[in-house]
Amino acid sequence: ASYFTFSGTGFQYASTTASKFNVTYTGKTVMVAARMTAVLAGAYRCLFGTNTGTRNFNTYIYSPSTGVYQIHYSAGGGGGLSNNLPLTTNQWFVAAVTQNVSGLVSYYFNGQAVGTNTGQTFIQYAANGGEFVALGDNYWYGDIGVCAVYGRALTADEITQNYTAIRNRYGI
C-alpha cells in the first residue's frame, strides 16, 4: 500500500489547494486511513485541518490519558470528542467524522460508529491559511494513506462502504 510518513513536526505535511474547498456544503465528512506512531497523554495529533484562521475540518486523534484515544473534530469554533477508541499505535485504522447542517457530528472508527455530538454549529467554508494533511495546530506522527474530504455528510452505510473498500489495502 502507498502512504506518506510524517514526523510529527511542522516540516512534514501535505498542502492542498484551498480554493477547491471554497464551495457550498450540505454537510462535511473527513475520512482518513492512518497509522499513528505515538502520542503523549493530553496531546492531539492532527490528521487534517488548518493551523491558521477558521477551522473548517480539523480532525485529530486525542489522547486524554496514556493508552486512551478519541477522535476530536473542530469546525467553526465548536468541537467535540468521540467515545474511546480501540486504537493500537503502529497499526492501521480508518477514522471518519461527519457533520450535518443541523449540527450533528458523528464519529466512526474502522467503519463502526463511536459516538456523536449535537449542537455543533455548522458553517460554510471560511477562508484561512490553507487546508493540510497532517498539519493543524499540531502535527501527525505516523503514516497517512488515504485522506478524503466530502462536501456532504456521508451516511453510516457510505462510511462502511468506504472502509470496506480500503481496509484490505492497509491490513485492517
Question: What do these predicted regions represent?
Answer:
Residues 17-19, 82-83, 95, 135:
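Generic recognition of flexible, low-complexity loop/linker segments
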Residues 1-26, 129, 164:
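Low-complexity, glycine/proline/serine-rich flexible segments
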Residues 1-10, 31-41, 51, 55-121, ...:
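Extracellular glycan-interaction surfaces
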Residues 5, 49, 131-134, 143, ...:
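Hydrophobic alpha-helical membrane-association signature
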Residues 28-38, 94, 98, 110, ...:
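Extracellular, beta-strand-rich glycan-interacting domains
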Residues 46:
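An anion-binding catalytic pocket shared by soluble metabolic enzymes
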Residues 74-76, 125-145, 149:
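Extracellular glycan-interaction patches encoded by glycine-rich segments
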